[in-house]
């Protein structure tokens, strides 16, 4: 559906060349929700704008449904872009137009027949839950409602792909969750492929199938959300995951536990979260486990339990216990203090 092949993009800033995106390659399957996460300045926004050629890459290829967008004529590109909707952090609504007209006007400019415009606007206002706001103006809406209008406007062109550029970053947590649930609904019911960028790992965790991590214009790691959370390899990815999974235990207390045993981070994936593997460790081996902290993350396709555990016992028994946990499907990582 979306193929990025060695895409690069640079800008001239005060006489200096700034490489915003450097040789990025990503493939997104039809119907997938794919996320790109990174800190500010990583190149995320530039990358997402390369997909519909709002930013034309200096090098590489952007291929949508087998078509290299860079080789299309202006007319062909306009047609191709109709299948790529986009939502932004800043809504970009017309202040003097009603909700209905904000959705309808782009369709009028596209030459869509009047009766078809009416049908589409009503359909997508219903999908985003704003049927009763059709005659309201943007100033009368909350931030979440404005974003819903922006989503309806993007959907009214009936795209196959929806690009999301930090669409939830200006919203409060409750509204963010509502928008994420709406995106999941759109993906499931309409079959639309979603490509989103964010600096919030929680957004990735809640709705994405796969994720790529960017730093300084480079793609440093990509994989399933589960793999990124449990088997992160790159330092930047580990910082993201580490900040998300932090239990905020005082350093002096952790040092006390390390002095008397081993500290391990355990991840229980899916059904393994319900298995008593840790409870059986003390029965099978001469080690004493103490749970210091824990929690459960709800991913798009399952659950991920996480525990910080102190294991007290000799080295041989400790090794046996760790092997048993791994064989039981638990992801185990020894915690090293700074």
Swiss-Prot record:
It is a peripheral membrane protein. It is found in: Cell membrane. GO terms for cellular component: plasma membrane. Its EC number is 7.4.2.11. Keywords: Amino-acid transport, ATP-binding, Cell membrane, Membrane, Nucleotide-binding, Translocase, Transport. It holds the Pfam family NIL. It is an enzyme of class 7 (translocase). ATP binds at residues 38-45. One of its GO terms (molecular function) is ATP binding. Residues 2-241 form the ABC transporter domain. It catalyses: L-methionine(out) + ATP + H2O = L-methionine(in) + ADP + phosphate + H(+); D-methionine(out) + ATP + H2O = D-methionine(in) + ADP + phosphate + H(+). InterPro entries: AAA+_ATPase (IPR003593), ABC_transporter-like_ATP-bd (IPR003439), ABC_transporter-like_CS (IPR017871), ACT-like_dom_sf (IPR045865), MetN_ABC (IPR041701), MetN_ABC_transporter-like (IPR050086), NIL_domain (IPR018449), P-loop_NTPase (IPR027417). The complex is composed of two ATP-binding proteins (MetN), two transmembrane proteins (MetI) and a solute-binding protein (MetQ). Part of the ABC transporter complex MetNIQ involved in methionine import. Responsible for energy coupling to the transport system. Belongs to the ABC transporter superfamily. Methionine importer (TC 3.A.1.24) family. PANTHER family: AMINO ACID IMPORT ATP-BINDING PROTEIN, METHIONINE IMPORT ATP-BINDING PROTEIN METN. This is Methionine import ATP-binding protein MetN 1. It comes from Listeria monocytogenes serovar 1/2a (strain ATCC BAA-679 / EGD-e). The gene is metN1.
């Amino acid at each position: 559906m979306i193929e990025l092949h060695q895409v690069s993009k640079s800008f001239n800033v005060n006489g200096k060349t700034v490489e915003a995106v450097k040789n990025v390659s990503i493939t997104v399957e039809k119907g997938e929700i794919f996320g790109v996460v990174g800190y500010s300045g990583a190149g995320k926004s530039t990358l997402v704008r390369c997909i519909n050629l709002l930013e034309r890459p200096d090098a590489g290829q952007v291929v949508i449904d087998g078509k290299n967008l860079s080789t299309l004529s202006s007319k062909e590109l306009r047609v191709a872009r109709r299948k790529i909707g986009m939502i932004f952090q800043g809504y970009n609504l017309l202040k003097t137009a009603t909700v209905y007209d904000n959705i309808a006007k782009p369709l009028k400019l596209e030459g869509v027949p009047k009766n078809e415009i009416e049908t589409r606007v009503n359909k997508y206002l219903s999908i985003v839950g704003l049927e009763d706001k059709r005659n309201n103006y943007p100033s009368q809406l909350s931030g979440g409602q404005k974003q819903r209008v922006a989503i309806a406007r993007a959907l009214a062109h009936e795209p196959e792909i929806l690009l999301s550029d930090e669409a939830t970053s200006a919203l409060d947590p409750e509204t963010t969750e509502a928008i994420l649930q709406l995106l999941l609904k759109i993906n499931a019911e309409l079959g639309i492929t979603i490509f989103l960028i964010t600096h919030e790992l929680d957004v990735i965790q809640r709705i994405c199938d796969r994720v790529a991590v960017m730093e300084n214009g480079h793609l440093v790691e990509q994989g399933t959300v589960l793999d990124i959370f449990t088997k992160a390899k790159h330092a930047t990815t580990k910082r993201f995951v580490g900040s998300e999974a932090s239990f905020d235990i005082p350093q002096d207390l952790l040092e006390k536990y390390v002095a008397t045993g081993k500290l391990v981070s355990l991840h229980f994936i899916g059904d393994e979260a319900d298995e008593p593997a840790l409870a059986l460790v003390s029965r099978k081996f001469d080690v004493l486990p103490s749970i210091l902290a824990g929690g459960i993350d709800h991913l798009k396709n399952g659950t991920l339990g996480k525990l910080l555990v102190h294991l007290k016992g000799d080295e041989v028994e400790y090794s046996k216990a760790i092997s048993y946990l791994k064989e039981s499907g638990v992801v185990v990582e020894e915690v090293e203090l700074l």
